[in-house]
Structures are given as structure tokens and as C-alpha cells.
UniProtKB/Swiss-Prot annotation:
Keyword Amino-acid biosynthesis among record annotations: yes
This protein's pathway: Amino-acid biosynthesis; L-tryptophan biosynthesis; L-tryptophan from chorismate: step 5/5
Keyword presence, Lyase: yes
The protein, known as: Tryptophan synthase alpha chain
Gene (name only): trpA
Amino acid sequence: MSRIANTFAKTKKENRAALIAFLTAGDPSIEATPALLDSLVENGVDIIELGMPFSDPMADGPAIQKANLRALAAKTGYNDIFRIATEFRKRHPETPLILMGYANPMTFKGSDSFAASAKEAGVDGIICVDIPPEEDATLGVAVREKGMDMIRLATPTSDEARLKIILDGASGFLYYVSVAGVTGLQQATEASIDAALDRIKAVTDLPVAVGFGIRSPEQAAAIAKKADAVVVGSAFVSCIEKAVTNRQDPNAALEKLAKELSTAISDARKEAAL
């Protein structure tokens, strides 16, 4: 099994959701990123999403937009991202690593070249935000040919017909974007997420991860009762920004939030069963 499949098998056996954390590569610097990733893994994060910096991150809210700008200001380039991934894989041989971003930084050297570099660096899956399935004639094919997962996104407006298109060629897990709009600004109601999960799980056996707008342990725990994974991005990125602004250690801030989220997610189903 793949590292992603192994992780979901493990969390299922432990009767808990997985915690997926997003950080932007190179934020606040290329040199700082490896230790920040270590802080997440060592404090309960199960899967890492590493964002590829881009100048026009249209699906992202203010926190991640600013993280992209900080990473670009730090001159984080294509090769830096794969170097960070390669080093991560050496330190964490079992933790899934996903590259997440936009078509432009992923494919400007060609889909085959990108997929080959990702595979060589130990990447497990790819999330490309702005290539819809029906327009994905090259990237998804290249990713799958290298044995990596092409992870698709579904939204509240994805009906059954649309879900079938999204799921065609999808693997690893399905990422459910729980609100319409950009990351980090809103949160869907628990009832609407539960209904969406029922609808999605009726048409796929893939694990379903829920993200967008999850900022607190309480929000994460509510979603973890039913979702297979909880994705947190803007909250972690905001921790980095706040720590850097206040000249504090961003690792300590990430460790604290990761522990709180991990504990809340691990306890969610135990409390629901009482």
C-alpha cells in the first residue's frame, strides 16, 4: 500500500480522523521550512500538504496569500521545493507528503518533468487547485504513471453527476472544500458537512478529507466525528506570520496548535460514543 493508504488504514484502526496540515514551502524562509515541517509531524500531524508558492493563488484567503508572498520574497524556487521534499522524506520515511498548488508552478517545465521530480523527491500525491478533471489531459496522467495519487477536490455545489467526473482518476483521498470561496475565511455548519459526507460516501470508497475554514480544536473535533481527515492550513500559516511579526519562535507556535488539534481530533469519536 501507499503511504497515504497506510495512514488512513492506521487512523481507521485507531477510530480517529487523520490530521492534515498545510504549509507554504519557503515561508518564512527556505531554511526555516524543514524544522517547521518536523514540528508538525512530531506533534500529531498525519499528512503534510506542502504548498508551492505562486504569485496569484486565487483559491486562497489572505493568510495563505501572504504566505505565498513571503515565500516568493525569500526567493523560493521550483528546485527548492523538491529539495525540501527530498530532505523531508529522509527524516520522515512513513509520513505522506503532498504537493499542493496551481498549474502554473507545477507544469511550466512540463507535466512529465514535474511528476518525475516529485516522485524522485518522495512525494506521495498531488493536489492541483485550478485544473478541473475534464481539462486534465496531461498532469493527472503523468502523476498516475509515476505511482503517485492525484487528489481531487469537491465542493458544496458538486452534485452526483459532477462527483462522478471528479472521482474518475482520483486516488488517495477526496478533498471536500466545505465552503464556497477562498481558504480560511468561513466555516460551513456541522450539519451541512455531515450531509455532504453522506452524499459523497455514497458514491466512493475513497477517504474524504474536509478543509477550508477550520481554525480551532473545537471546529476540528466536530468535523472529525464523521470525516476521514481534517485539513488545517490558514490557522498554521497564521501562526507563522504572528510569530515572525512578534519575533517569536514559529516552531513553538506550530507545536502548540498541532498538539491541540491532534488531541481534539483523537478524542472526538470517543466523546461522541459516550
